[in-house]
Amino acid sequence: MRSVLTISAGLLFGLALSSVAHANDHKILGVIAMPRNETNDLALKIPVCRIVKRIQLTADHGDIELSGASVYFKTARSASQSLNVPSSIKEGQTTGWININSDNDNKRCVSKITFSGHTVNSSDMARLKVIGDD
């Protein structure tokens, strides 16, 4: 009887964990090394067709200045969308959610996200971590 209760409790706990994990569909899409000089062609390519509704940006290992970002969709016409990104992100700071692909009727796959910007206040290259939510 005790083993049945232990198994039942274990199954319930496992189901609770899996529902929490499913509710939080945040995935690291990739990391970009930010050069010290202003660069406008930093691309994060998404190899698998992925519908992403919004992204967050985190500055790892240095401060970052951004002058722009765009998202490109896998469509016949290579559609793109400019993103409203903050001009600076301090080391360890994470931005709020930046909405993309807001047209729910036309779910488009993201093929790449490009950034313009550079590392500031560091002799090493900062890293820009891109987190996606689908």
From Swiss-Prot:
The keyword Signal applies. InterPro entries: UPF0412_YaaI. Transmembrane segments: none annotated. Keywords: Signal. The keyword Transport does not apply. It comes from the Bacteria. Residues 1-23 form the signal peptide. Belongs to the UPF0412 family. This is UPF0412 protein YaaI. It comes from Salmonella agona (strain SL483). The lineage of its organism: Bacteria, Pseudomonadati, Pseudomonadota, Gammaproteobacteria, Enterobacterales.
